[in-house]
């Protein structure tokens, strides 16, 4: 495990000055996309950048809620709104402009009358969505039509964050705020817990993505450099212990 950019933050540039909290993160195989939230305005921006931390593009202000998870598929970015109801925001990966919204079709009312989602991962069949306030994963096709669902077999007793899919398994990030007790839990596609990794790094784990046979985890690190002055860093880690 190690820093991808050494001690440098991947939140950089004047465009992100007021967008201090990194949220969801993903990769298209070449570029990395990270959501940054401006908490007081409840708006976000997306930074598209390279593996050597060079900015390709920063989006304009986006009304995408908390923006707590993001995934890439077919030229688009799909972003969870968290408490915004049955909606997934769609943003062009090339222009970083919003293209519209998707809604899960045929969602069973016996599961939830008012579903919302706080994690998303692209999978071969379509997408896996984490139902807000539940241990349930929803599987939809590429048109967001409901296929099936399952419950994760074990609740991890810290805050759930982003999610990634690879080789028939879901990788879910958990954090304990800024207490540096971060975890990655691995589940199969029936919800069975296969393994839990304990990641001891400074800050709060926010997201995870897989690229070129490697896993990476994003960290939101809040600290005080001077008295009464808070500093924020978005740091990216290579998780070499996860194969």
Regions found by a protein language model. Give the residues of each.
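Beta-propeller domains
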Residues: 2-3, 33-60
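A short beta-strand motif characteristic of beta-propeller blades
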Residues: 6-17, 54-61, 97-111, 146-154, ...
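Repeated scaffold domains used in trafficking and secretory/extracellular systems
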Residues: 18-26, 63-74, 107-122, 155-164, ...
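Short coil/turn segments that connect the beta-strands within blades of beta-propeller domains
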Residues: 29-30, 74-76, 124-127, 167-170, ...
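Structural motif
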Residues: 41-47, 85-91, 134-140, 179-186, ...
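Blade-loop segments of beta-propeller domains
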Residues: 53-82
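Loop/turn-rich, solvent-exposed surfaces of beta-rich toroidal or solenoidal domains
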Residues: 154-187
């Amino acid at each position: 495990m190690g820093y991808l950019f050494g001690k440098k933050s991947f939140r950089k540039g004047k465009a992100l000055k007021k967008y201090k909290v990194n949220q969801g993160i993903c990769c298209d195989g070449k570029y990395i996309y990270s959501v940054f939230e401006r908490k007081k305005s409840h708006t976000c921006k997306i930074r598209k950048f390279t593996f050597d931390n060079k900015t390709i593009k920063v989006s304009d202000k986006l009304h995408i809620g908390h923006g707590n998870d993001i995934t890439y598929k077919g030229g688009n970015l799909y972003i969870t709104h968290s408490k915004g109801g049955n909606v997934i925001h769609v943003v062009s990966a090339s222009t970083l402009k919003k293209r519209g919204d998707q809604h899960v079709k045929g969602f069973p009312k016996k599961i939830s009358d008012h579903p919302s989602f706080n994690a998303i991962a692209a999978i071969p069949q379509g997408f896996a969505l984490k139902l807000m306030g539940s241990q349930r994963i929803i599987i939809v096709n590429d048109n967001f039509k409901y296929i099936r669902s399952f419950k994760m077999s074990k609740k991890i007793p810290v805050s759930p964050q982003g999610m990634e899919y690879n080789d028939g398994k879901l990788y879910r990030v958990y954090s304990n705020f800024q207490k540096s007790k971060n975890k990655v839990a691995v589940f199969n596609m029936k919800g069975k817990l296969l393994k839990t990794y304990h990641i001891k790094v400074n800050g709060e784990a926010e997201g995870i993505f897989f690229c070129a046979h490697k896993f990476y985890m994003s960290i939101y690190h809040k600290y005080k450099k001077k008295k009464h002055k808070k500093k924020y860093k978005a740091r990216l880690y290579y998780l070499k212990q996860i194969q």
